[in-house]
C-alpha cells in the first residue's frame, strides 16, 4: 500500500462527504481502521514503563467519565434523538469532546444510530446482535461498507 493511499484513508476518517461507496461493497474488515484501535490499547501498556500516580489515575478517570457523558448525553440523546435543546457553544464543545472518545464525529454517529432505530434487530440494522457479538460491537464500523456518513438519515 502506497504512502498516498494510507494518507488518503487517514484523511477520509475525518471528512468522507466526497467518498462514494457502492452498495455491494464487501463487509470485510478494513485493517487501516483497525490499526488505531490496536495502537490505542497497546499504548495503555506504557503505564508499566513510565509509571503512574494517583493524580494521573484521577485525570484518566475524569477524562473517561467526561467523554462517556459526551457520547451518552450529546451524541446519543442530543444529536441522534434531539431529546433536548442547547446552545451552539455546548453543541461544539461536547461534539469535539465526544470525538476524542474515538467514536468519529457527531453527525456520523447520529446518522448510523438513527438508521439502527429504523431497522432495529432486522437484517438492515448494521449493528444488530443477529450479526454476531463481535460484529455488533465493533466489526460493523471497521468495514468500508459502513464507513460513510448516512446523510439521508440526519
Residue ranges with predicted function:
Residues 1-154:
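Non-catalytic, topology-defining segments of multipass membrane proteins
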Amino acid at each position: 500500500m502506497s504512502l498516498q493511499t494510507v494518507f488518503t484513508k487517514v484523511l477520509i476518517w475525518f471528512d468522507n462527504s466526497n467518498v462514494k461507496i457502492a452498495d455491494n461493497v464487501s463487509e470485510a474488515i478494513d485493517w487501516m481502521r483497525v490499526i488505531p484501535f490496536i495502537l490505542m490499547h497497546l499504548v495503555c501498556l506504557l503505564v508499566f514503563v513510565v509509571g503512574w500516580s494517583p493524580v494521573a489515575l484521577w485525570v484518566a478517570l475524569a477524562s473517561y467519565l467526561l467523554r462517556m457523558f459526551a457520547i451518552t448525553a450529546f451524541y446519543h440523546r442530543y444529536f441522534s434523538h434531539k431529546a433536548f435543546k442547547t446552545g451552539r457553544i455546548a453543541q461544539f464543545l461536547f461534539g469535539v469532546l465526544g470525538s476524542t472518545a474515538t467514536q468519529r464525529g457527531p453527525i456520523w454517529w447520529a446518522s448510523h444510530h438513527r438508521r439502527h432505530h429504523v431497522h432495529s434487530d432486522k437484517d438492515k440494522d448494521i449493528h444488530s446482535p443477529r450479526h454476531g457479538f463481535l460484529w455488533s460491537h465493533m466489526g460493523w464500523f471497521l468495514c468500508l461498507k459502513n464507513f460513510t456518513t448516512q446523510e439521508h438519515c440526519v
